């Protein structure tokens, strides 16, 4: 997305690398890059972007049939359809758009996961990545109209 199409104070579509797309309403729903996108519309939002760690192990027989979340540690564990344990969490304390994690955070998430599900210690780790997530100061999402008519936000 290159920018917003505007007529007066109204957003009428978006400009992309493949051309213009006109719309009566445009929604900004860009996990991890909402503040960047909002700036293209001239808006400043109280959102910071942080890296959230994620890992997946080799597949095993069913062990977890739902998402287990630990709010105090900002971590979660679930199991994929292919049997891999997916776990992650622990926001990096610095604003970043990097799709990788820093070693102390990676260690912290792995330590919490091992304490929660000790069986992880016997599994091969297949992948690790950092995903960018948007955070407000109180952790609540911003879902609203913007001052520009026709432009909405879910960030």
Regions found by a protein language model. Give the residues of each.
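Active-site lid/adjacent beta-loop-alpha segment flanking the redox-cofactor pocket in flavoenzymes
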Residues: 44, 59-150
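Active-site-proximal helix/loop microenvironment
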Residues: 155
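Short beta-strand micro-motifs in enzyme catalytic cores
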Residues: 12, 51-53, 141
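Central helical "cap/lid" subdomain
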Residues: 16, 20-65
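A conserved short coil-to-beta-strand element within the FAD-binding core of flavoproteins
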Residues: 1-12
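Nucleotide phosphate-binding site architecture
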Residues: 2, 35, 152
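General structural feature for long, well-ordered alpha-helical segments within catalytic domains
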Residues: 10, 14, 22, 33, ...
């Amino acid at each position: 997305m290159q920018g917003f199409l505007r007529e007066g104070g109204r957003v009428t579509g978006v400009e992309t690398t493949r051309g213009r797309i006109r719309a009566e309403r445009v929604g900004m729903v860009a996990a991890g890059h909402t503040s960047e996108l909002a700036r293209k519309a001239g808006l400043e939002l109280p959102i910071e972007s942080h890296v959230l760690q994620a890992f997946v192990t080799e597949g095993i027989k069913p062990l977890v049939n739902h998402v287990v979340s630990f709010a105090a540690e900002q971590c979660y564990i679930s199991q994929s359809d292919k049997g891999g344990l997916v776990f992650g969490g622990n926001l990096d304390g610095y604003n970043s758009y990097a799709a990788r994690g820093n070693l102390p955070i990676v260690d912290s998430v792995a330590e919490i996961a091992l304490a929660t599900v000790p069986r992880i210690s016997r599994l091969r780790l297949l992948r690790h990545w950092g995903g960018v997530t948007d955070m407000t100061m109180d952790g609540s999402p911003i879902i609203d109209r913007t001052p520009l008519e026709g432009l909405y936000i879910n960030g």
